[in-house]
Amino acid sequence: FNPKAAEVAMEDYKPGDKLVPYRVVGECMGTDLVDSEYEQLIPWVNPGEGAFRVIQGDYVTTEDGTGIVHIAPTFGADDAFVAKKAGVPGLTMTTAKGETRPMVDMTGKFFVLEDLDADFVKANVNIEAYKEFAGRFVKNAYDPTLTDQDETLDVAICMMLKQQNLVFRIEKHVHNYPHC
């Protein structure tokens, strides 16, 4: 937040203004937030009980990040370790063959609904919300029909969140993230 915006009256704000007014209504330590529950931002798949709550971890530093981060236990070793320790389930799908898999298949795209177990889909997938992104590659480089000029999945997701008024600000943040 821009400190100058703290002086802007809430009623003076108009959409598109550079300064977005805010007020600090309280302060707390990060440990005060542990076990707080929150609402799933993109409710495509229900991963199970206890998935959306604040947990404690010690591998994010002020040099590496903000100190509060989203974790993806299905895709990172550190995330998997801290999630398992706290009893947070990974976000996985059950395939039509009965296999438990991450949301992204072995080719680098979100599973298409037809490749998933019908009972799993019925019980756990918000078909309306997910179907627009089912079958999309997470990186354009994985899809031989796409180029660098085509819209990327991350941009499409950001635009969806913006259209649903679920995001405060979208910006690129370069950071280290091990992946294969």
Spans of model-derived segments:
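Non-cofactor substrate-recognition interfaces
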Residues: F1-C180
